[in-house]
């Protein structure tokens, strides 16, 4: 969470540098600092993402350019693969922004662009895969049931924000390393 002055601030946070430990991967470090996979890999192009050497200096890109959009509610920057949430502010209180990395649609499953609203929220959701997703999984030898119940194997994770766009939602994941990649349906 960052406080900022909407009249003059377009950037929040600051870059950090840490030292990699023996068992670290860039994916592990990204999750620890609320970053996506591509964010941390792009900030450390000379570092092996799966085997950084112990003692290697790792740049933590926790400085964020705020989107050029109305700063209210949820704003998603697809190019940055990042969600920005601008909560309502009480009079006299500083404006805040909360930001999280996210995965976006694969190239063949383009993420839509435009204005929508959150139609509903659910904790521990079931997932009803679309026929095309079930067909794709069956073709790959991984058939899906008609309904995936809540739990650790549910691709929706533990929370879902259903959007007014049919079949689109902002949701958790059962595969945290996919955060910050083009891997979603």
Walk through the language-model features, giving the residues of each:
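Short acidic beta-strand-loop surface patches of small beta-rich interaction domains
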Residues: 41-49
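Active-site-proximal cofactor/substrate-binding loop regions of enzyme domains
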Residues: 38
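Loop/turn positions that initiate beta-strands
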Residues: 23, 53-58
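Gly/Pro-biased beta-strand-loop elements
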Residues: 67-178
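Short, intrinsically disordered, charge-balanced linker/junction segments flanking boundaries
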Residues: 182-185
